[in-house]
A protein has these predicted regions:
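Intrinsically disordered, low-complexity segments enriched in small residues
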Residues: 1-78, 82-567
């Protein structure tokens, strides 16, 4: 109905839920109802963290939560860029959007908050939308492409220069509300409990991060550095998770940077600069992330970088999650190639040069032809065509990312137990078991295939708990800040007196609350599951890489016992 109100939350809520994802969860349970994801009663919530808008390194992020139309569970997505920074500097920690507009609309936040009916912008893809709104004022724009308008279940909410709240399909929720965009411009100073000490800490952490080899690698190569690092570990799946037989060097970060004119992109307050912008013809386009290159490269069987750049550009403009889109299309290619699907409405898109993929992406985003079925995601579509569940690369209906569980077994257990579906960012065990650990909080690297001990499973649990704090603070996952510095940053910004033990307990409680909410939304214990497609041994690879059924059952059983013991 266009009503706008501003409310303050009690201090105890901030202490218990921190901000970002945590406060989003609190607001969802406070204002949300058990309803269809596309119901007006399903709120769309955008939040900043206590560090957002401050100079703390790599804190320029925001969180989006709602009930996911893809998983039908609690959906959460995190994005960088400048939107979160501007939201916080406009004087707000977040927003809860109820109902649905009767006409496509835009929310503007600058000196005041207003809702404008803008049917002229409905039908535009994201880049045109962004340009139009920036002509009016230098806004940070968060908005939809055509996929969100058409309620593609894995549509993303784009912002700024190719940044995306990508996973769980929250763009479709935004589209169901007839909300095309939110445009924000903020110039206020974010209050800090102890400004001098906070700035001193910021300098210390920035210096530490800049000197880190991981930071230097990401700055030089972007996230595509994993195309170079992961191949020797068997971590980059090819041929729809059936092997690792691919010329990975053809899509290496070295080749990318030598062939194309590339510049780096920094989100707000970022000291890393992992983003990439590519000059292609007369345009500068957003470069692909590792997950995009891997899912549209080796997973599909394509070594043409030009095609990946083109597809990534279209997917971002249409506003879809590149992981879900890439896994879906790679699965279809495999099913067509092996005769599992012979339907001409699908097989017609696939040939040896992948010339039909561009049309397939556009048809999905536009809900056109077979795209109207494919927009439901891989699991729903594959089951409707008789593909057995164990051959579908999803967990809780969300497509599996590009880190092979057979390379890092705890990553597989993390996929199975994640509250939002297959998710490599809720616990980055592929990094932990390569030595990026935090032993002081029980995150300890170990043998990537020997995981059947309490210490190893607790490493996953502790990593999951700590990730909740990162996503609530909010800090970019690439910034490996020492836990004691995270505690100090939160205390100096909020005035609270957190300890690391208290924050780890908060992380555990947030996961417990998300799981309890998911159960109310229909999740069952059997949904903690990993398909045998990504567990079975690949010919010629070590026996210990396989995750057999009995091992998976044992890991899940002990995980749940240990999770209950720390809750």
């Amino acid at each position: 109905d266009g009503d706008i109100s501003v409310e303050s939350l009690p201090e105890e809520s901030w202490r218990k839920y921190v901000g970002g994802m945590g406060i989003g969860l609190y607001l969802y349970t406070k204002f949300g109802k058990i309803s269809d994801p596309f119901s007006p009663e399903n709120p769309l919530i955008i939040t900043a963290g206590p560090l957002t808008g401050t100079p703390f390194p790599n804190s320029g992020r925001h969180e989006v939560v709602s009930r996911s139309p893809l998983t039908e569970l609690f959906g959460e997505a995190n994005s960088g860029g400048f939107f979160g920074n501007d939201l916080k500097k406009s004087g707000y920690d977040g927003m809860v959007i109820h109902g649905a507009a009767d006409t496509p609309s835009i929310i503007f936040i600058d000196e005041n908050i207003r809702i404008e009916k803008r049917p002229d912008l409905w039908g535009k893809d994201f880049y045109a939308l962004r340009s139009e709104l920036r002509r009016e004022k230098k806004f940070s724009v968060m908005g939809l492409g055509r996929a969100g308008e058409n309620r593609v279940l894995f549509s993303s909410i784009m912002n700024d220069e190719g940044r995306a709240a990508g996973r769980t399909g929250l763009g479709a929720v935004m589209g169901s509300k007839n909300l095309k965009a939110i445009a924000v411009k903020g110039n206020l100073q974010v209050p800090l409990a102890d400004r001098k000490k906070f700035f001193d800490l910021t300098k210390k952490v920035s210096t530490y991060l800049i000197s880190s080899p991981l930071t230097q690698g990401l700055n030089s190569n972007g996230s595509m550095i994993w195309m170079d690092m992961g191949q020797g570990m068997g971590d980059i799946p090819s041929n729809y998770f059936h092997d690792h037989n691919f010329d990975y060097d053809s899509l290496s970060s070295m080749k990318f940077h030598s062939v194309y004119k590339v510049t780096s992109y920094h989100c707000a307050n970022c000291v890393i600069g992992c983003g990439r912008t590519v000059v292609k013809g007369s345009r500068s386009i957003d470069g692909p992330e590792y997950e995009t290159v891997a899912s549209f490269g080796p997973l599909l069987g394509n070594n043409n970088f030009d095609l990946i750049l083109e597809w990534n550009d279209i997917i971002n403009d249409k506003g879809m999650d590149t992981i879900s889109t890439g896994v879906l299309i790679s699965a279809l290619n495999y099913f067509v190639k092996t005769g599992r699907i012979s339907d001409k409405s699908i097989s017609g898109y696939f040939d040896s040069t992948f010339s039909g993929i561009k049309n397939l992406i556009e048809d999905i985003a536009e809900s056109r032809g077979i795209g109207n079925e494919l927009k439901e995601g891989l699991e729903r579509f594959a089951l409707s065509r008789g593909i057995p569940r164990d051959e579908i690369a999803t967990v809780k209906k969300m497509e599996i990312p590009m880190h092979d569980p057979r390379a890092f077994k705890l990553q597989g257990l993390g996929y199975a137990t994640s509250t939002r579906g297959a998710d490599h960012l809720q616990a980055e065990m592929y990094e932990v078991d390569m030595g990026v650990d935090h032993r002081e909080i029980g995150i300890v690297s170990g043998d990537r295939w020997q995981v059947n001990t309490d210490e190893r499973i607790m490493t996953l649990i502790n990593s999951q708990n700590y990730r909740q704090i990162y996503n609530s603070a909010i800090i970019c996952s690439y910034a490996k800040v020492n836990p004691e510095d995270v505690v100090e940053a939160l205390n100096l910004s909020t005035g609270f007196d957190y300890t690391i033990d208290e924050l780890m307990n908060i992380g555990a409680l947030l996961l417990d609350e998300k799981r309890a909410l998911n159960i109310r939304l229909g999740m069952k214990d059997t949904d903690d599951y990993l398909p045998s497609l990504v567990r079975k041994k690949i010919e010629g690879e070590p026996e210990e890489s396989e995750i057999k059924d009995e091992e998976m059952e044992s890991l899940l059983k002990r995980y749940n016992e240990l999770r209950r013991s720390v809750s």
